[in-house]
Amino acid sequence: MARVKRAVNAHKKRRSILKASKGYRGQRSRLYRKAKEQQLHSLNYAYRDRRARKGEFRKLWISRINAAARANDITYNRLIQGLKAAGVEVDRKNLADIAIADPAAFTALVDVARAALPEDVNAPSDSGEAA
């Protein structure tokens, strides 16, 4: 049986790893073993952060909506509650875009939400009763 030397395959594999690790600093871009290890970590980070990015964008949208809502004298929580009660189905991404691009339309949505909200039982009453 003929002996199989893996010269071509091994060099091709090493070349592909080193090519993929081109932008890394120091030994991680030049030495195969270090480059391979860094490549594994990099792919793990990329996989993890593609999923984390979705949550980060949601946080950003909520912050933007909250800022615009408070400028209209309502909290984010009450705004979302009112929009759900009014049957307005607009997601947070589009709501944040509306808040930035078209403040007048956002104010109209706030008015719709306010009209659909039940009376706040925790709000201070104007009847003058002392607690």
Swiss-Prot record:
**What does this gene product do?**
Binds directly to 23S ribosomal RNA and is necessary for the in vitro assembly process of the 50S ribosomal subunit. It is not involved in the protein synthesizing functions of that subunit.
Q: What is this protein called?
A: Large ribosomal subunit protein bL20
- Return the similarity comment: Belongs to the bacterial ribosomal protein bL20 family.
Can the keyword Ion transport be found in this entry's annotation? no
Which parts of the chain are coiled coil? Answer: none
Q: Which UniProt keywords apply?
A: Ribonucleoprotein, Ribosomal protein, RNA-binding, rRNA-binding
Any Pfam family matching the protein: Ribosomal_L20
The GO molecular function terms of this record are: rRNA binding; structural constituent of ribosome
Question: Does this UniProt record's set of keywords contain Membrane?
Answer: no
Q: Supply the source organism for this entry.
A: Mycolicibacterium paratuberculosis (strain ATCC BAA-968 / K-10) (Mycobacterium paratuberculosis)
Entry's Gene Ontology cellular component terms? ribonucleoprotein complex; ribosome
Which InterPro entries would you find in this protein's record? Ribosomal_bL20 (IPR005813), RIBOSOMAL_L20_CS (IPR049946), Ribosomal_protein_bL20_C (IPR035566)
For biological process, the GO terms are: ribosomal large subunit assembly; translation
Q: What domain of life is recorded for the organism? A: Bacteria
Bilayer-crossing regions: none
Q: Which gene encodes it?
A: rplT
Please name the HAMAP family in this protein's record.
Answer: Ribosomal_bL20
